[in-house]
Amino acid sequence: MPSRKSKAAALDTPQSESSTFSSTLDSSAPSPARNLRRSGRNILQPSSEKDRDHEKRSGEELAGRMMGKDANGHCLREGKEQEEGVKMAIEGLARMERRLQRATKRQKKQLEEDGIPVPSVVSRFPTAPYHHKSTNAEEREAKEPVLKTHSKDVEREAEIGVDDVVKMEPAATNIIEPEDAQDAAERGAARPPAVNSSYLPLPWKGRLGYACLNTYLRNAKPPIFSSRTCRMASIVDHRHPLQFEDEPEHHLKNKPDKSKEPQDELGHKFVQELGLANARDIVKMLCWNEKYGIRFLRLSSEMFPFASHPVHGYKLAPFASEVLAEAGRVAAELGHRLTTHPGQFTQLGSPRKEVVESAIRDLEYHDELLSLLKLPEQQNRDAVMIIHMGGQFGDKAATLERFKRNYARLSQSCKNRLVLENDDVGWTVHDLLPVCEELNIPMVLDYHHHNICFDPAHLREGTLDISDPKLQERIANTWKRKGIKQKMHYSEPCDGAVTPRDRRKHRPRVMTLPPCPPDMDLMIEAKDKEQAVFELMRTFKLPGFEKINDMVPYDRDDENRPAPPVKAPKKKKGGKRKRTTDEEAAEPEEVDTAADDVKDAPEGPKEVPEEERAMGGPYNRVYWPLGCEEWLKPKKREVKKGKVPEEVEDEGEFDG
């Protein structure tokens, strides 16, 4: 059997290496046929049938070696011979790669000698359209790189049999526009500076509010919030009865038994119980807000999970009527305003029928939720549903027409509550105001969204131009015509955000008030929720700021905590010995002393009544500084790792 070196030498002979492209080195030889590859390179084909057969045999031999077979197709013996075959295959592939690289260089040189223009960058898709963004014809001629294709070259390609002539057009994926050459962050930072108003709505007479979640109550034990939810799979699983139906559910010891017959009413009951727990906590949130001067709250859209789902959806009445009516009664007594904000997928202007149907179901669900609160007439009128127009779908005018048609399909109760909001992507105040005036829909102004998405033909970035009295009057009239108290939204971008994408993210807390009327209902959209409202109240000394005090880090005195365990008296150490008569007489005194030790044990914390739980305690300690959200939870115990004795470490090194 020939050795590995002899085979490698045979594969690396000049004849085998140059067999494929030997004709290219002979200038007197006729130019071989060229076929266009996908990459745009013209690779010369073998001109000799003998060379093609040799290449085929070499490839088959390499493939056989990789599969453990020899040139005749017989299986090689395992062991050293098979290992040598793998190494030979790897070496052969490396040589093939080197030959391909050399052939490419020769082919490129041949094309240059033939006078065929070679583009420096060849697109994978040479026919991709190229659209330049120049403002006039002169700039376009000066900036566009033009690679002309000579007619002689086209005729030459036709003669040699090329099917598709490569047009040397600059590819859209490889040409960098002058406008796009600048980094996105630099473009954002280089935009015209914002022009802000110096007006502050002081003294403040309006209502400040936050959205959905109270961070202080959410971290109470047990937590108080109204957005408990579940997965769709949980609803499906809970259609099966529990393993032990007479015992309460447990995530490990008593789970739904999928071997039992499913019942749809059990799945509905599971998700409805979540909704009822959410609705019950509204009362606690309203009482907490009243104590600290907050009388404006946005209810969570996730209060009743999957209520608008096409399959697992359900009506809120009658199972939630009583709980929601109780929440509405408390809100009416305290004079609080409640609103909702359906999600971003609620789009009446979508061209997709299923999206529109889902949006209508979602709006009907929110309307039923607000109606079951049974609020007084004016408060019920002020309980609005705010939505965005959504996507533009390539044509703003067509989207607006679809919105008008689908708006007409809503029930009158939904129409009475629907409000449009300008967004930070594509719909400006000037886009929405005409349709709001036409359809008698109130428009809520979001200052933060306006600073990102506005019409430069009418306004500049900032709060000054948007505060124009004529424009503000048009916005206010959309509310007055329906007798609804106007509201606005305010938030600020995070520090260091310059691109539109980064600027959309809300800062944890806002630093100032917008130039709105001093009696406005202002929704503060910030990550820190009620703490952002507290920050404004403290900064501008708004009514109620004196009630708010700082928390004690990691300690809350408004929760019931378990009493500390009573330590048993320590027994005196000593060996057994015979007692004397005097010691036996003193024995009763020792017993009394031990009993006194038990009586003097520290008392546990006083029990906090349910109505005072998580309300801030006697000193109203509910404020946590910016970035100190961990104060809301008990401090984590630090586990100190004991040192391992050196003897043990030494023994471990020699364990086998």
UniProtKB/Swiss-Prot annotation:
This molecule's function is given as:
Endonuclease for the repair of UV-irradiated DNA. Involved in the excision of cyclobutane pyrimidine dimers (CPD) and 6-4 pyrimidine pyrimidones (6-4PP) which forms the UV damage repair (UVDR) pathway.
Q: Which residue ranges have biased composition labelled Basic and acidic residues?
A: 48-82, 135-146, 550-561, 596-614
Q: Which family does it belong to?
A: Belongs to the uve1/UvsE family.
User: May I have one GO cellular component term?
Assistant: nucleus
- The Enzyme Commission number assigned here is 3.-.-.-
Q: Name one GO biological process term.
A: nucleotide-excision repair
Matches recorded under InterPro entries: UvdE, Xyl_isomerase-like_sf
Q: Where is this region: Disordered?
A: 1-82, 119-146, 175-194, 241-264, 492-515, 550-620, 636-656
- Gene3D superfamilies per the UniProt record, alphabetical: Divalent-metal-dependent TIM barrel enzymes (3.20.20.150)
- Encoding gene, per UniProt annotation: mus-18
- For this protein, what is any one GO molecular function term? endonuclease activity
- Keywords for this protein: DNA damage, DNA excision, DNA repair, Endonuclease, Hydrolase, Nuclease
- Skewed-composition ranges (Acidic residues): 583-595, 647-656
Cofactor or coenzyme needed: Mg(2+)
Return the Pfam families for the record: UvdE (PF03851)
Q: What is this protein called?
A: UV-damage endonuclease
Question: Composition bias, kind Low complexity: at what positions?
Answer: 13-32
Q: Where is the composition biased (Basic residues)?
A: 568-579
